[in-house]
Amino acid sequence: MTLQHEPSAAFAETLALRALTFLAADGERLGRFLSLTGIGPAELRRNAGESAMLAGVLEYLLQDETLLLVFATDVGVPPEAIPAAHRVLAGRQQGDDS
């Protein structure tokens, strides 16, 4: 299954929030995410709904193909939906989709 077009901003946000939930559901995954990104738990809670944080969560998944594939399977989306959603959120972060 391939994507025919870029996902909507709402889909991208929802997917990123699901990715954050996926990471948070496993202490080891969450610990690795926090360690590698340098984000603290308080900062994560405070900024969880921000485009920059959500883009960062998806970017983290993009750095680990195995984790990305596990997440995609877990939530039932094609793996290529993750970089597409990242592009949408990164564009919003940069103000490209006003």
Which ranges hold each PLM region?
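Metal- and O2-centered redox machinery and metal/ROS homeostasis
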Residues: 1-98
